[in-house]
């Protein structure tokens, strides 16, 4: 199952972004394909979080939207 998460911003130390990254890691450990997408991404997180403009942001079986 593909489970993607959308958050408005991914900043290190931000509760929503940090929680979303932890959830993504847990989903991956459980055998699911999972990625995190954001509108605004800190430079240091660009290798870990994908932009909303990525075509893969629209694929998946489940999308979790956090605000």
Which residues does each PLM region occupy?
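A short beta-strand-loop structural module common to alpha/beta enzyme folds
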Residues: 33-43
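A short, glycine/small-residue-rich beta-strand->loop->alpha-helix junction that serves as a flexible
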Residues: 7-19
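Extended catalytic core of nucleotide-activated donor transferases of GT-like folds
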Residues: 43-67
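A short, Lys/Arg-enriched amphipathic alpha-helix followed by its capping loop at the start of a domain
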Residues: 22-32
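Extreme N-terminal starter segment of soluble prokaryotic enzymes
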Residues: 1-3
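Charge-rich, low-complexity amphipathic helices
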Residues: 18, 24-25, 49-50
């Amino acid at each position: 199952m593909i489970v993607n998460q959308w958050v408005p911003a991914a900043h290190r130390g931000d509760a929503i972004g940090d929680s979303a990254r932890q959830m993504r890691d847990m989903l991956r450990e459980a055998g699911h394909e999972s990625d995190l997408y954001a509108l605004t991404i800190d430079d240091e997180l660009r290798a870990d979080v994908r932009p909303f403009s990525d075509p893969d942001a629209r694929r998946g079986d489940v999308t979790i939207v956090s605000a």
